[in-house]
Design a protein with these regions (language model features):
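Cytosolic catalytic domains that perform sulfur/thiol-centered chemistry
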Residues: 1-285
């Protein structure tokens, strides 16, 4: 069974064949958790795809919000991406060093959030690219600024107030994509000061399950994604909101669902960094 929206995911071969096309822009979106010991900017400077610019989710954010990498205003997003040479008419290809593409999926979602649908994730990311012996560089490009028209689609994002209200209304199903131990409250959170557990009524589908570890962590097939959703008790006919630790890996699940035709998935941007960091939110363990 093919993907319903295959244009959202491109292969390393496709990128190798099209990376020199005048409308294609490669975007390195690498991000690591605070306790990883590495940073995206450092890894980008070491090696990246030829011509790729670096999109830092800790820079393209709402600087006034204490929560990690919350979405910026449309004006800030437009200002940041135009300086990266990303604009109207570009076919934007996102990838990361992480394997799987969760950080790339966050940037994919952000571009769609701000009205740019011609965007895709390179399946398998840099690890797959390197495993195939494809070229990388440490040269930093100097992009020419382009115009980017940003129009935010507010239906694609949820606030904590909306999630709190939803606990009673149950209008939407919340899919928590953190690892099972974190969901159950038996494993610690990577950020200090977070309570453990999950939101009442949330479903758990760990985002890592959506990747194939034996194939450089490429996205699983449409059949496999549907089977995983069914196993988790997720009803694809219901309105869905994905949540994670800080709004990054939630976007990988949104990408997976988008690929199989579920296009209206929203992201709880604050995710567990917000929910687990407060004392007035209900938690189940």
């Amino acid at each position: 069974m093919p993907y319903s929206n295959p244009q959202a995911l491109v292969s390393t071969t496709w990128v190798a064949d099209h990376m020199s096309a005048p409308d294609v822009r490669l975007v390195d979106c690498t991000y690591f958790l605070p306790n990883d010991g590495r940073t995206g900017p450092e890894e980008y400077k070491k090696q990246h795809l030829p011509g790729a610019v670096f999109f830092d989710i800790d820079d393209v954010k709402n600087a006034d919000d204490p929560l990690p990498h919350m979405i910026p205003s449309a004006e800030v997003f437009s200002s940041k991406v135009r300086k990266l040479g990303l604009g109207d008419g570009n076919r934007i290809i996102c990838y990361d060093h992480n394997g799987g593409g969760s950080a790339a999926a966050r940037v994919w979602w952000m571009f769609r959030l701000f009205g740019h649908d011609d965007v895709a994730v390179m399946d398998g990311g840099l690890p797959k690219w390197l495993a195939e012996g494809r070229p990388v560089t440490d040269d930093i490009p100097t992009p020419q600024e382009r115009h980017f028209t940003a129009r935010e689609n507010h239906m694609m994002v949820r606030s904590i107030e909306q999630i709190l209200s939803n606990i009673d209304s149950k209008r939407e199903d919340v899919i928590d994509v953190r690892a099972a131990g974190r969901f159950a409250g038996t494993a610690p959170e990577p950020r200090a000061g977070m309570r453990s557990g999950h939101m009442p009524g949330a479903f758990n589908l760990p985002y890592g399950d959506l990747m194939d570890p034996e194939k450089n962590f490429v996205m699983r097939s449409a059949e496999e994604i549907k089977a995983l959703a069914d196993k988790a008790g997720i009803d694809m006919k219901r309105p869905l909101v994905t949540s994670c630790g800080s709004g990054v890996t939630a976007c990988y699940a949104a990408l997976a669902f988008y690929l199989i035709g579920k296009e209206d998935v929203a992201i709880y941007d604050g995710s567990w960094s917000e929910w687990g960091g407060r004392q007035d939110t209900p938690i189940v363990t």
